Amino acid sequence: MFPFERQNKIIHLLDQNNKITVPELSRILDVSISTIRNDLSALEESGMIKKVHGGAVLLKSEEKFTNFNDRIIRNIEEKEAIAKEAATLVKNNQTIILDASSTALALAKELHGFSRLTVITSGLYTAIELKDNPNISVILTGGIVTTNSFTLEGILGANLIENIHADLCFMSAKGFTMEEGLTDFNIYETELKRLLAKRTNKLVALLDHTKMGVISTASITTAENIDLLITDNKINKALYKKFQDAGLPVKIAE
């Protein structure tokens, strides 16, 4: 059983039982206690559950909403600096892709001065931010709405994505290393990001310093496929040099 299948079963069990213990999950799913703990950590990180002593409970709807809003304000100065730098790459008449990350939402706020711009996004907040701008056309990718992150997930919109071509794709992730590339914890969102990353002339990674050197559950794309990485000025100097030595273009937003 794949991790995402196991984690879906955990969510289903919690939905039925409100709370469940680690030993119970280990017995029901026939895996080790350490595997269950890893699954619970991944689910908590994605905003689906809350770990409690000896087990886990589902988050209430209002807690899930707060979870995404917490992400928006976390490292907000760094995200805003990255967004402003990213906006300098955008030109009128372009088609761009924005993922559903809070950093991409910060970039969306920088786009209101552009004209005849087409924005393809998997982020509901991003679409809402841009929807009333008459100079910007917004296309949602399609997929399943997840209340914890206000994101469209899955590949229900695969046919649409396969028929688009963007000038730029701006994408964030849970982590990045030269060895593993961009990685994220949400299997379904990662699947969608993989498709989007292939439909652009230029892939730009938007990553604040806390994402560097981090490896998460699922791979989005390799470092070789990234055309530019934009980060903030708190990036570890040794990592910055490693990226440069490997030939990865890096822009530091001030």
From Swiss-Prot:
Residues 20-39 bind DNA. Keywords: DNA-binding, Glycerol metabolism, Repressor, Transcription, Transcription regulation. GO terms for molecular function: DNA binding; DNA-binding transcription factor activity. The gene is golR. The lineage of its organism: Bacteria, Bacillati, Bacillota, Bacilli, Bacillales. One of its GO terms (biological process) is glycerol catabolic process. Disruption phenotype: Cells lacking this gene show a constitutive but glucose-repressible expression of the entire gol operon. Involved in the glycerol metabolism. Repressor of the gol operon for glycerol metabolism. Residues 3-58 form the HTH deoR-type domain. This is HTH-type transcriptional regulator GolR.
